[in-house]
């Protein structure tokens, strides 16, 4: 299965995580990996049967990154039946603990409402936050939560383990 990373990044942190960690790890488990900035997305990108990995930082008080915010109304109109997604998000669990990685949850809600399947749920254990829209249940996020502000030393291991998990989950789907 091919992988399409679709992401937005204002400050470059999401881009950094993709370039520094995610691309290398994904190439171990998947044949072809491409990345597409949501700012430049062609609507036909969604027509493939790739694994879509969504990258979304959360801004301010639980808001979407600016390019995702500009695209969200179009995103809500897409049909995701038969499509598989994984989501990773960046947030600050200390400074914005009441909105930690809310962007994951906002996009997950749309994906599920439009018929998509989300793999790659990630445990909440080890994080310190008070609330999050990204929770699939009390013990898991819809996707990988990354805190480059407070736990950047943990990003590599989290990405590595998550990508291995994605590889295993995709094998089960095929």
Model-derived segments and spans:
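N-terminal beta1-alpha1 ligand-phosphate binding loop
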Residues: 2-25
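A structural signal for isolated positions on well-ordered beta-strands in alpha/beta enzyme cores
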Residues: 2-4, 34, 86, 119
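Conserved beta-strand termini and adjacent loop/short-helix elements that scaffold enzyme active sites
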Residues: 6, 36-38, 121-124
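A generic secondary-structure micro-motif detector
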Residues: 11, 32, 96-97
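Short helix-loop-beta junction
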Residues: 18-31, 109-113
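A short beta-strand-loop structural module common to alpha/beta enzyme folds
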Residues: 30-42
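TIR-domain catalytic/interaction hotspot
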Residues: 40-50
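FMN-binding flavodoxin-like domain, especially the glycine-rich phosphate-binding loop
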Residues: 48-52, 56-174
């Amino acid at each position: 299965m091919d992988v399409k990373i679709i992401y937005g990044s204002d400050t470059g942190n999401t881009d950094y995580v993709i370039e520094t960690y995610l691309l290398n790890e994904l190439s171990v488990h998947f044949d072809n990996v491409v990345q597409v900035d949501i700012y430049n997305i062609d609507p036909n990108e969604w027509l493939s049967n790739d694994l879509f990995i969504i990258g979304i930082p959360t801004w301010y008080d639980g808001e979407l990154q600016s390019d995702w915010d500009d695209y969200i109304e179009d995103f809500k109109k897409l049909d995701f039946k038969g499509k598989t997604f994984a989501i990773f998000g960046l947030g600050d669990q200390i400074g914005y603990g009441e909105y930690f990685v809310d962007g994951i949850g906002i996009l997950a809600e749309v994906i599920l409402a439009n018929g998509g399947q989300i793999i790659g749920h990630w445990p909440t254990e080890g994080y310190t936050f008070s609330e999050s829209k990204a929770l699939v249940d009390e013990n898991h996020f819809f996707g990988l939560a990354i805190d480059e502000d407070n736990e950047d030393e943990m990003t590599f291991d989290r990405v590595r383990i998550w990508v291995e998990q994605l590889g295993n989950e995709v094998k089960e789907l095929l």
